[in-house]
Structure formats: structure tokens, C-alpha cells
Amino acid sequence: AFFRRQRQMCIRDRLKDKRFDAVVTAPVQKSVINDSGLSFTGHTEFFSEQFGCEDVVMLLVNHGLRVALATTHLPLREVPDAITQESLLRKLEIIHNELMRLYGISQPRIAMLGLNPHAGEGGHLGREEIETITPASEEALRRDIDVTAPIPADTAFTSKQVLDADVVLAMFHDQG
């Protein structure tokens, strides 16, 4: 009951009135919340539902490193189907626009990770990079969004492309 009252107060009395500019969330044990009788997948889904906003991006920020997620809290087996060219383009547009608006970055650089090991190894370890992720990055470039082709996630965070980026777009929750 306490959690329910607090979240409603936060939404109704603070965010919708624009009394706060941002919300910082901390990790929570979702199973405890769900075991109490409340349905709770995560903060991102909660705020999306409260504000009636279908297109959302989870952004993790820590000391100059920003990581956005293409999907939210999904079982790993559902991730490939959730990643479409259209959904990636929408995420890239949101990230691009919000980095300009919130951080004053005039031309945000986005490093996009691949989904499969080694970014699919040219189709030998999965075709999502070839069929979905690369076409999305190519279309985003045509829309003047500065994004890389899929980068292998296993070495991404040591890559100069990622270190020089304003944000990394990971394909799923624990990849980011």
C-alpha cells in the first residue's frame, strides 16, 4: 500500500505538474513488489503506462557514460522479435533529440551494439545485424542521425567508437 501511494503521489502530484525536471530511479527487487500483489515489470514500463507513452527509452547514466536500451525488461528469448527496423529508428530518433534537448549536444554520436555474439559475424551467428540493425543505422544516417553500424558488444566498451560516442545503444537490458 505504501509503494502504491508513493508512486501515485510521484506521478500525479509532481511529474504531471512539472514540479520535477527528472526522476532518478534505483534498482529494486521486482519480485518483492510483484509478490506483494502489485504488477511491476520495471520503472520504465511503469512511467510509460502512467503517462500513456508508447515510445520510451531507458537511459543509464554514470560519470560521462550513457547507455540507452533498445528494449526494456523482456525475457531474452523475446528480444529478437522486439527489435525491428522501425523500433530501432524510433529509439534512435528519441535518443538523438533528447541528447540535444537535455544535454545540449548539437550532433549526438550514437554507438549501436549488435545483438548477436560478435555482431553476428557476417550472418554466421545470426542475421539480425544484416536484416534489421544495419538497415536501421543506414536509414538513421539518411535522417542525419550520427550512428555507427552494429558494434560487437563483447568488446564495445573498449572500442574507440564507443569511447568517442555520446551514448551507446544496447539491444537488450543486460547487454547495457
How should these model regions be labeled?
Residues 6, 19, 163-164:
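Alpha-helix C-terminal capping/helix-to-coil transition sites in glycosyltransferase folds
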Residues 25-45:
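Short Gly/Thr/Asp-enriched flexible loops that form oxyanion-binding sites at enzyme active sites
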